[in-house]
């Protein structure tokens, strides 16, 4: 599990802290039911044998952990996610830095589908992992991409968005998962009534923060649909603990 080392710094880092709790909760849930566990950057351990069989690290991607995730599963390896201990990562502290980082994540996440779609459709991962993958493709990429034009059309025509039931369900599941993840992390320090109220506020704030993904995914989809693969990587600035 990734944890944000500077989580208390500002709104953006607090949002990233809640986001990592949500991601850890979902990732563990996916692996428990035999779904597709994913690598998450720093703190990951990869067997040398597995890396050799998959052809090593891919130099033609900007998110090597996401790319390797697919190649490992296509080669019938499993990825386990450990909730404890957490590996700390310095969160970005500004909207601009967040924009560059999340665009890189979104583009790399998209690119792996484009690179391996034929093998995925051949069910090389197995039925359970393939269905799990398609469900998260729908919720992480397709639905956010469709939600933005749907909302704009709803405003222009003075009607409710067509996708509002699916969007509402996705947001509800996200909030529930985020709260459950935060509770599980907080249990290490003990819980009382005020703790639950604080975690609820963190969940609401984290959900508002997560709305940036709608813009990121939509813009990335539009860009990748008309531009060739470009592998643009903007370095994330880290300052350390001073």
Regions found by a protein language model. Give the residues of each.
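Short, hydrophobic alpha-helical packing/hinge segments within bilobed ligand-binding/sensory domains
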Residues: 68-69, 98
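Catalytic donor-sugar/metal-binding loop of nucleotide-sugar-dependent glycosyltransferases
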Residues: 34, 60, 69-88
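Transmembrane helical bundle of ABC transporter permease
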Residues: 17, 93-97, 194, 198
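Active-site-adjacent helix/loop segment of glycosyltransferases
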Residues: 99-141, 149
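Long helical/loop segments within the catalytic core of UDP-sugar-dependent glycosyltransferases
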Residues: 1-62, 99, 103-114
């Amino acid at each position: 599990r990734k944890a944000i080392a500077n989580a208390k710094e500002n709104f953006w880092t607090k949002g990233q802290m809640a986001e990592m709790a949500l991601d850890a909760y979902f990732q563990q849930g996916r692996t428990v039911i035999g779904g597709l566990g994913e690598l998450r950057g720093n703190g990951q351990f990869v067997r040398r044998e597995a890396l050799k069989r998959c052809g090593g690290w891919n130099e033609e991607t900007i998110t090597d952990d996401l790319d390797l995730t697919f190649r490992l599963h296509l080669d019938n390896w499993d990825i386990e996610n450990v909730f404890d201990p957490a590996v700390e990562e310095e969160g970005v502290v500004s909207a601009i830095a967040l924009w560059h980082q999340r665009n890189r994540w979104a583009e790399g996440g998209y690119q792996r589908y484009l690179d391996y779609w034929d093998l995925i459709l051949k069910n090389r991962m197995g039925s359970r992992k393939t269905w799990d993958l398609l469900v998260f493709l729908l919720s992480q990429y397709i639905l956010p991409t469709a939600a933005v034009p749907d909302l704009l059309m709803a405003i222009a025509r003075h009607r409710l968005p067509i996708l509002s039931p699916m969007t509402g369900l996705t947001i509800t599941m996200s909030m529930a998962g985020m709260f459950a993840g935060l509770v599980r992390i907080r249990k290490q320090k003990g819980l009382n009534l005020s703790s639950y109220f604080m975690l609820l506020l963190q969940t609401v704030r984290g959900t508002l923060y997560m709305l940036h993904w709608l813009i990121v995914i939509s813009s990335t989809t539009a860009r990748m649909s008309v531009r060739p693969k470009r592998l643009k990587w903007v370095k994330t600035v880290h300052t350390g603990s001073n």
